[in-house]
C-alpha cells in the first residue's frame, strides 16, 4: 500500500488499479476533442467515465499536438476552470488538471482540482511551490524538452531507464525543496515524450525499476504512438494495444492508468482480477437474462442471426 495526499484527500493505492479518465476541453485534441465541443458535452463525458469506473478525471485545455499553435492563457482558463468546478462540485470527482502553467494550475485548484498533472517535467518550479502551498498532488513526468516540442532521436539515450530514473529523482528533490510532502508526488515515465517508439517500449519493459523512487507510478499509455507503431493503427483504433500495455503495467506494479476508454479498461480489470484468483466472484454470480446470446426472442421479434459460435 502506498499513500497519496491530494489536498484534503488521503488515497490508498496498491490494492487495485486506479483509472484516470481523460476529458479534453481542447477542440484540437489528437484523440477526441472535436466530439465534445461544449462544456455540457464535456460534463456528460465526465459523468459517463465515472459511471464506467473512473477514479480520477483528468481535464486539459491545450492539445499536446506540436502542429497546433499554443492556446492563450486566458482562453485555456476559460475552457478548463468552469468544467473543473462542475466536475468537482456537481459530480464529486477527484479532478486532475493537465497543465504546466502555474496561473492555470492555481485557478484549477481554486475551482476544485486536487492533482496537477505537469507534462513539462517541472520545468517551472512555481508549480511545485503552488502544490506545496495548496496541498495538491503533483505528477512529475519525464521529458528532457519543453512542452509541445517533438524530439525523435534514436541516439538520445544510452540506458534510457537509468537516465529517466536520474531525471525523476532530481525532479523529486526539486519538488521536496519547494516544500512538497513526499506523499504528494506521483511519477510518470512519459511514454512518447521525447522518445521514439523503440525507446518508449524499452523504458516500459523496465518499468519496475522506477519503484526505486518510492512513489506511485502513473502510466499514460492510452492510444500512444508506440502502440500505433507496433500495430499500424490510428489513435482511435488502439484500444487492444492500450489494454495490452495496461496489463504489462499491472504486472510491473503501476498504480494509476490514464485512459480514454474507461469502460473497456474497467471490464478488462474485472475479468483479469477474477481470473487471477484472490477472493474470487460470489458463488451466486449469474449472467443477466438480457445478456444471453441465446435468449428467447421477444414477442413479435425475429431471433437474432448467429454468425459465429460463442462457446
Predicted features and spans:
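N-terminal carbohydrate-binding accessory modules
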Residues: 1-16
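Phosphate/pyrophosphate-binding loops at sites that engage ATP/ADP/AMP, CoA/4′-phosphopantetheine
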Residues: 50-51, 169-184
Amino acid at each position: 500500500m502506498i499513500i497519496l495526499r491530494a489536498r484534503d484527500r488521503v488515497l490508498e493505492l496498491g490494492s487495485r488499479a486506479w483509472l484516470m479518465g481523460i476529458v479534453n476541453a481542447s477542440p484540437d485534441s489528437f484523440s477526441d476533442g472535436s466530439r465534445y465541443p461544449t462544456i455540457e458535452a464535456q460534463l456528460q463525458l465526465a459523468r459517463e467515465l465515472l459511471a464506467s469506473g473512473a477514479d480520477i478525471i483528468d481535464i486539459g485545455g491545450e492539445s499536446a499536438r506540436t502542429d497546433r499553435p499554443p492556446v492563450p492563457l486566458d482562453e485555456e482558463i476559460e475552457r478548463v476552470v468552469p468544467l473543473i468546478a462542475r466536475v468537482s462540485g456537481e459530480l464529486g470527482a477527484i479532478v486532475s488538471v493537465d497543465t504546466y502553467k502555474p496561473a492555470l494550475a492555481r485557478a484549477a485548484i481554486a475551482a476544485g482540482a486536487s492533482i496537477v498533472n505537469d507534462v513539462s517535467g517541472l520545468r517551472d518550479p512555481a508549480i511545485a511551490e503552488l502544490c506545496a502551498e495548496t496541498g495538491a498532488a503533483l505528477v512529475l513526468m519525464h521529458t528532457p524538452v519543453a512542452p509541445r516540442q517533438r524530439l525523435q532521436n534514436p541516439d538520445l539515450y544510452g540506458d534510457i531507464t537509468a537516465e529517466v530514473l536520474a531525471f525523476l529523482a532530481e525532479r523529486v528533490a526539486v519538488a521536496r525543496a519547494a516544500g512538497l510532502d513526499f506523499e504528494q508526488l506521483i511519477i510518470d515515465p512519459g511514454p512518447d515524450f521525447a522518445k521514439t517508439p523503440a525507446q518508449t517500449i524499452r523504458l516500459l519493459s523496465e518499468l519496475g525499476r522506477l519503484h526505486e523512487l518510492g512513489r506511485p507510478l502513473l502510466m499514460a499509455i492510452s492510444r500512444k504512438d508506440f502502440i500505433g507503431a507496433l500495430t499500424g493503427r490510428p489513435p482511435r483504433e488502439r484500444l487492444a494495444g492500450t489494454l495490452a500495455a495496461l496489463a504489462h503495467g499491472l504486472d510491473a506494479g503501476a498504480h494509476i492508468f490514464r485512459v480514454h476508454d474507461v469502460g473497456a479498461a474497467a471490464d478488462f480489470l474485472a475479468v483479469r482480477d477474477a481470473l487471477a484468483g484472490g477472493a474470487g466472484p460470489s458463488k451466486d454470480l449469474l449472467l443477466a437474462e438480457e445478456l444471453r446470446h441465446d435468449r428467447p426472442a421477444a414477442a413479435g421479434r425475429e431471433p437474432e442471426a448467429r454468425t459465429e459460435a460463442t462457446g
